[in-house]
């Protein structure tokens, strides 16, 4: 049995790509997209007709509407291939605007429903800012499920659990990147591998907290740099993995056992943690890595949204 099939026995495997033509070979349950992945996809020749057709159908519409319709087109193509859910992201430039995030999310859901898609098959991705978490809380109350992304800290995860969001995406690889850069020449790759990887440790702490306190929010590890990070999180609720790493899992026959254990977490001696807004903002501020990576991630997704707009203008 290859490692991908082994992983599927105890973790829901999710494909992290906008390139939906790669999905069938890996047979993931769910799929995730983001502005960067969609931008990458529409620049490939095989997806140019989809972009051009969407733009042609949207003459006279606002740029926001065109982008949402393009994201939903990709989402519908993905849902025709996978049995589960697709994550579609709200514009990162709305990350500090609760009301605008809610409005945009509801519009995306309306577009999916117009295509006959059951809304339970769609997760709305929103950056895990305080405003984003509050938007997700309201959306969940309205029956719209959310995926809180750009999550780098325990404080973000706690607030998402309090808000009863459907799913969170802690970014393993970007946490790893930050610590490796900070350590510089002192970084010891072997010592920081597997369960000792800082990104893996972060997801493990969040997973154990959720399971210990009976928090229903799903944990989906994301942003992987190597197979060791993936195998060290086997047993996590979900893992979203890029096609390149999915292919490497298929190519490996190394034994794989669960590394995370929900039942074991229930028996751990863990402190209860809750945040109000002031406490949460202070906790995030105290975490230099999370503060920097959250801001950097929002800027990067926003920049790619601008590039996507430029592509749309050029194709029109």
Swiss-Prot record:
Task: State which residue ranges cross the membrane.
Answer: none
| Pathway, per record | Carbohydrate degradation; pentose phosphate pathway; D-glyceraldehyde 3-phosphate and beta-D-fructose 6-phosphate from D-ribose 5-phosphate and D-xylulose 5-phosphate (non-oxidative stage): step 2/3
Name the reaction it catalyses: D-sedoheptulose 7-phosphate + D-glyceraldehyde 3-phosphate = D-erythrose 4-phosphate + beta-D-fructose 6-phosphate
UniProt keyword annotations, A-Z:
Cytoplasm, Pentose shunt, Schiff base, Transferase
Localization terms from the record: Cytoplasm
Q: Which GO terms describe its molecular function?
A: transaldolase activity
GO terms in the biological process aspect are:
carbohydrate metabolic process; pentose-phosphate shunt
Q: Where is the active site?
A: 125
Q: Which Pfam families match?
A: TAL_FSA (PF00923)
Q: What is its EC number?
A: 2.2.1.2
Which GO CC terms are listed, alphabetically? cytoplasm
For the keyword Repeat, the answer is no
**Which top EC class is named for this enzyme in its record?**
transferase
Q: Does the keyword Lipid metabolism apply?
A: no
Family membership, please give it: Belongs to the transaldolase family. Type 1 subfamily.
| SUBUNIT field | Homodimer.
What does the protein in this record do? Transaldolase is important for the balance of metabolites in the pentose-phosphate pathway.
What is the protein's name according to its record?
Transaldolase
Tell me the gene name.
tal
């Amino acid at each position: 049995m290859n490692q991908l099939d082994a992983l599927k026995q105890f973790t829901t495997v999710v494909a992290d790509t906008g390139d939906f033509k790669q999905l069938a070979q890996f047979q993931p349950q769910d799929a995730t997209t983001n502005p960067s992945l969609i931008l990458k996809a529409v620049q490939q020749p095989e997806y140019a007709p989809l972009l051009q057709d969407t733009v042609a159908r949207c003459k006279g519409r606002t740029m926001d509407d065109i982008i949402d319709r393009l994201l939903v087109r990709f989402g519908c193509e993905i849902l025709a291939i996978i049995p589960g859910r697709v994550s579609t992201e709200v514009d990162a430039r709305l990350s500090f605007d609760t009301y605008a995030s809610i409005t945009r999310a509801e519009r995306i859901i309306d577009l999916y429903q117009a295509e006959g898609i059951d809304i339970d098959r769609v997760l709305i991705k929103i950056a895990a800012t305080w405003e984003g978490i509050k938007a997700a809380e309201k959306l969940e109350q309205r029956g719209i499920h959310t995926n809180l992304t750009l999550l780098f800290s325990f404080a973000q995860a706690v607030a998402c659990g309090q808000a009863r969001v459907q799913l969170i995406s802690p970014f393993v690889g970007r946490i790893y990147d930050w610590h490796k850069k900070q350590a510089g020449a002192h970084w010891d790759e072997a010592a920081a591998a597997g369960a000792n990887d800082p990104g893996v440790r972060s997801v493990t702490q969040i997973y154990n907290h959720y399971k210990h306190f009976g928090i229903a929010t799903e944990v989906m590890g994301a942003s992987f740099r190597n197979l060791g990070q993936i195998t060290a999180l086997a047993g996590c609720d979900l893992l979203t993995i890029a096609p390149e790493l999915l292919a490497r899992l298929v190519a490996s026959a190394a034994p794989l056992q669960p590394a995370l254990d929900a039942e074991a977490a229930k028996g751990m001696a863990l402190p209860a943690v809750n945040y109000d807004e002031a406490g949460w903002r202070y906790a995030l501020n105290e975490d230099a890595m999370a503060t920097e990576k959250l801001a950097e991630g929002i800027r990067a997704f926003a920049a790619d949204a601008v590039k996507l707009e430029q592509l749309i203008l050029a194709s029109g």
